[in-house]
Amino acid sequence: MQSFLTLLKEHEDTCAPPAELVTLAGRLCRDFQDDLAQLQPLVTAILDSQLRLHLLDNADVALACARVLDQQEQQQAACRLLEGCQVPGGSQELVQLWNDIHYRLVMRRLGVAALTPVQKFRCRKRNPPPPSLCPEGLKSRNFPREVREKLHNFAVGVNTNPSKAERENLALETSLTPEQVYNWFANYRRRQRALPQHMKPAQQATAEDPGARERGPDLLQPSGNPRVDSGFVDRPQWSEEREEKGPPQSPQTTQGPWEPLALAPDFPADETVSKPLDVSGHPQSVQLEEGLGTSSGRTELRVGSFLVTQPPLQAPEFILTQSPPELAPAPSAFPGPVSAMELSQALPSSQVQCSDSQASGDAFWGARMLLEFSGSSLG
């Protein structure tokens, strides 16, 4: 020990230690491997030396230093030391020490006194040893391909739970022990039982929603697109919302915005034309207009969004000339109906508009255009 410490101090400033110094360090570590009390001062001197990287390339020195660090509860430092050493040809003892250190780390984390074989296997898979400790790679624990095929053929064709005599025969044929054969078939049965359990969640998901694959994207109508109904014009969304909310009824009319106009029985059916209009103002307005220009003076009555056109009458100062008894009352479903005679008596001969609010210019010019087109088509 003293001679080693003396040589170590003499070659402290050298780039590489002499071969006899490395050999002496390895022999001392191998001799004191069972006596940690004497090994600890030697390990401390090696780790504090500037030549430690060269000394740790010796398998006995690396093994002694890692054991001392592990004994001092410095597992992380021991793992870093094993990762940094470059042992020629590797060392199975260093690989086993690497695994033992990680076993203790897992036991400390789980709070258990020992690990099961499965836990040790998972620990080795998660923490493989560095390539410097096993240059040829980890030794495969799997059976050869021919052995696995023979055992699998027996499980598929004969029995998955062979008897003791069958296991002994298989052990002789495959050069395995009866315990290895027993464990292989036990693992095979465990894997077969686990397959249906993995398939159940997918089958349940498919059974709960069988049309998930066939379901296409829902075709939704945009909220801004108008709806077209039979006998009605396109109605934008804002007008539908106003109809659902129900704006206050005008005292001049009680007709709904899309209800047909109640006509007197004296009106000839062939001379009466009902035209839907696009409502841009208040839907509850009532207008009586006398067309001009190419419409030949046709009379139009608009209630809500409907336009009723009638050929011109003889009396120029009134829109309608029938007497009150000849006019049919409005349907009883609408309280307080207003007859066309009452409206005509209070209106001038040219144009009168009676509504809750002033109709917009777009609606007025739209009505005039429809009036001209209807006059030209009917004329």
UniProtKB/Swiss-Prot annotation:
Q: Where is the composition biased (Basic and acidic residues)?
A: 237-246
A GO molecular function annotation here is: DNA-binding transcription factor activity, RNA polymerase II-specific
Q: SUPFAM superfamilies under this entry?
A: Homeodomain-like
InterPro entries the record matches: HD, Homeobox_CS, Homeodomain-like_sf, KN_HD, SIX1_SD
Sorted alphabetically, the Gene Ontology cellular component annotations on this record are: nucleus; transcription regulator complex
Where can this protein be found?
Nucleus
Q: Which SMART domains match?
A: HOX (SM00389)
Q: What are the recorded Gene Ontology BP terms? A: regulation of skeletal muscle cell proliferation; regulation of transcription by RNA polymerase II; skeletal muscle fiber development
Task: Spell out the CDD domains in the cross-references.
Answer: homeodomain
- Main localization category: nucleus
Keywords from UniProt, A to Z, are: DNA-binding, Homeobox, Nucleus
Region Disordered: start-end pairs: 195-283
One Pfam match, given by its short name, reads SIX1_SD
Gene3D superfamilies membership: Homeodomain-like (1.10.10.60)
Please give the superkingdom of this protein's source.
Eukaryota
Q: Which residues bind DNA?
A: 135-196
In the UniProt record, the signal sequence range is: none
Query: PANTHER family from the entry?
Result: ANOMALOUS HOMEOBOX PROTEIN, HOMEOBOX PROTEIN SIX
Name the chain's protein: Anomalous homeobox protein
Organism per entry? Homo sapiens (Human)
Origin organism lineage = Eukaryota, Metazoa, Chordata, Craniata, Vertebrata
Gene designation: ANHX
